Amino acid sequence: IGSQIRWSIAGSDISLMGAYLYENQLHYSAPISGVGNAESEANDYLLLGASANRAIGKLLLNLDIAYSHDVLADVLEQSELGLAPQVITLAMNKLGATAGLEYAINNDENIMLGVSAETFLNSKDSLNSGQTLIGDSSNGNALLRYSNSMRNGDALLAVTLQSALDAASLLASVSLNYILTDQLAVMSQIIATRADPDSALAVLDEDLRMGMTLTWSF
């Protein structure tokens, strides 16, 4: 449940919003015993945000800021009795921001650059002695995308590069969608990934994937 206010001023759009996500996706964690089904917990939290867009000729600028209050985070807690550490959840506050620009080279080509980052606020102050936040308290990504619509829209080429802001991982992809007839369309894609051992994408280091999909409409 929430509300939004929007203003449009000479090529710019500005909006403010607030919402309470009481039906948000459940937060899952491993059972304390280490065996059995995962434990679920309601992940309701308050979300406040602001968004601004500005068009300057062929250039579109955008900025989004979001504040999340009492969002659940996984924390590793050491036992004072010398038992094995266990994973618990704590409600913490998070701040995120996204900035981007999109430039229309012509009617068929455009290029987009975006940067996003998020961080837990006062994460160290929220943790007691013996508690450690699982994962990074701050993370971010940069995205560069080029797209070209060819043959009167029958073919669409897209080249995408995505990297973590700390350069711990890099993903590159090339895709081509082509409409053969009114009933047939084909999509091909190549994805290459590089990641450091401590990255969330470590299992995909030096990974190369190729795929093709044929769609028939009738």
Show where each model-derived region lies.
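Outer-membrane beta-barrel "beta-signal"
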Residues: 190-192, 204-218
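Gram-negative outer-membrane beta-barrel proteins
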Residues: 22-28, 69-75, 107, 119-127, ...
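Transmembrane beta-barrel strands of outer-membrane/channel proteins
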Residues: 16-20, 63-67, 113-119, 159-163, ...
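Residues on the lipid-exposed face of transmembrane beta-strands in outer-membrane beta-barrel proteins
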Residues: 3-7, 50-54, 99-103, 144-148, ...
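Residues that define the transmembrane beta-barrel architecture of outer-membrane proteins
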Residues: 1, 42-48, 55, 91-97, ...
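Repeated loop/turn-to-beta-strand initiation elements of outer-membrane beta-barrel proteins
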Residues: 11-14, 58-63, 108-113, 152-157, ...
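Extracellular loop and loop/strand-boundary signature of outer-membrane beta-barrel proteins
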Residues: 33-38, 79-88, 128-133, 160-162, ...
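Long, well-ordered mid-to-C-terminal structural blocks that present hydrophobic/aromatic surfaces
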Residues: 42-129
